[in-house]
């Protein structure tokens, strides 16, 4: 059951959660000096939730979708932050562009595969296949990407979280020094959402 508007509301809810928590998550990973552990956690949570999409009725499915999409979008924060680790200043633009292009290609291939398999395994089966492929294609990043930096903050989780909040506040105050930055970030949110909707 359900309709497109229900999916839209669920998507908005998950993106609002990302919007609220993303700066804190980014600051937390910066203070820890590590991204892979956070990426592993968000990816595994997303995979786990995706497996159960479509099971248990409409409302549970929407709630699970909110959680899965939140974990996926949060994982992108840590994934994107790995770019300096896998590139140099000279080739960073090329590496980043190549990664984005391959990602969009993967989306097209995934959609094509979904069209071919949907009739035989159904929507619920497609969610399970998507979860499996997401996990499989994430493993090389977990295994082969080696971060150079060590943890910069060895205190308790509570202290790390408090420090991240303080760092976030300082960063937000500094945005006043760059008038165009806030407009760019807000525009980026709507641009990225439109692109994701298109693909």
Regions found by a protein language model. Give the residues of each.
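Symmetry-related core transmembrane helices of the 12-TM Major Facilitator Superfamily/SLC fold
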Residues: 124-143
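Structural signature of the two symmetry-related core transmembrane helices
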Residues: 36-52
């Amino acid at each position: 059951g359900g309709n497109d508007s229900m999916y839209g509301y669920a998507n908005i809810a998950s993106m609002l959660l990302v919007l609220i928590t993303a700066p804190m998550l980014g600051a937390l990973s910066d203070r820890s000096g590590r991204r892979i552990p956070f990426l592993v956690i968000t990816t595994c949570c997303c995979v786990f939730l995706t497996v159960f999409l479509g099971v248990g009725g409409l409302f549970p499915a929407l709630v699970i979708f909110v959680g899965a999409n939140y974990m996926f979008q949060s994982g992108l924060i840590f994934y994107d932050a790995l770019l300096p680790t896998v590139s140099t200043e000279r080739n960073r633009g090329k590496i980043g562009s190549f990664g984005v292009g391959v990602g969009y290609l993967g989306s097209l291939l995934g959609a094509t595969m979904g069209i071919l398999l949907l009739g035989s395994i159904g929507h619920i089966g497609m969610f399970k296949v998507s979860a499996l492929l997401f996990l499989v294609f994430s493993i090389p990043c977990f295994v082969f990407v080696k971060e150079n930096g060590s943890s910069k903050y060895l205190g308790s989780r509570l202290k790390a979280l408090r420090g991240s909040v303080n760092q976030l506040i300082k960063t937000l105050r500094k945005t006043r020094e760059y008038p165009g930055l806030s407009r760019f970030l807000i525009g980026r949110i709507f641009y990225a959402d439109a692109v994701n909707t298109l693909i």
